[in-house]
Amino acid sequence: MKPLVLTAFALVLAVHALDASISIPQAQAAQRPLERFTVTADGHPLAVWARRPAAPVGAVLFVHGRTWSARPDFDLQVPGLSRSVMSTFAAQGFAAYGVDLRGYGATPRDKTDWLTPKRSADDIVSVLTWIAEQHPRLPKPTLVGWSRGAAMAGMAAQMAPDRLSNVVLFGFAFDPDLKFVSIDSDKPLKLKNSAAAAESDFISPEITPKAVISAFVEQALKTDPVLVDVKKDDEFNDFVPAKMETPTLLLFGSDDPGMVMDDAGKMFAKLGAKDKQMVVLPGADHAAHLEDTHDAWVAAILNFIKRPASRR
């Protein structure tokens, strides 16, 4: 996946500063079954995948990035390893959901054959609304977006702050003083995805077992054989960090080649939310949630969700 970045530093929490009381129960991680739901957004069916404990304490929606859909990104099955984000969150007591945006995974393209940022953000809001309806006694869902999905998650949080309780922007930051531009083709290209593209995010062999890469390539090409056609990237200019009021976690790996530290610090400083954190995972890259940094990535998000309120 190629991260969406245009291309000061206010707060960084190193992973070793995270709450040590959070442990990731690997043996239980695969116990919850994978469920599939269909959520209708503006008349279009969206595939939503879930792993849910019997009595969840919260709900989380994961939004994939540019190239691959929810299952390879957030429910990766690796023999002998626990790398499914949804399984790990379910084992921690959270109802974990992942959406396939239009054209991705099990969700068909719409009649336009294109996907735009605003269309995606509107669909994310529809799924957030549906999740809240499934869990009326729980807090509103936490929204987690990866790479391009983080930009769309930011748009959704800004559009409908009443539909979520937190937003996590993972593997994405930009200079708020610059503008996004659109470079659109005349017609949808429907290019075939490749094994090389599936391998491209795994750039750190010291934290990336070959089994993870092999599993991702196989599962990603199976779910997403054709690249979705996107346009109107200038709509990302609707995401204005200063207008973001939802509690926000900015999360990325120290070795993510798509992240510019100065841009991350500048964006973090301009976030309108008073309740915000930035966490840098040492040694991690763009696919931190799938590599040996999986547990640290999960712990960063759980710590943010479970952060205590002020009290005397």
Give residue spans per PLM region:
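N-terminal cap/lid segment of alpha/beta-hydrolase-fold proteins
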Residues: I24, Q28-A54
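Glycine-rich "HGGG/HGxG" loop immediately N-terminal to the catalytic nucleophile
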Residues: R71-P72, D100-L115, H286
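Alpha/beta-hydrolase active-site loop
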Residues: W114-Q134
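Alpha/beta-hydrolase fold nucleophile elbow
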Residues: H135-S147
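Short beta-strand/loop motif that positions the catalytic acidic residue
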Residues: M244, L250-F252
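Conserved alpha/beta-hydrolase "acid-adjacent" motif
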Residues: P257-D263
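Catalytic histidine-centered segment of alpha/beta-hydrolase-like enzymes
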Residues: A284-H294
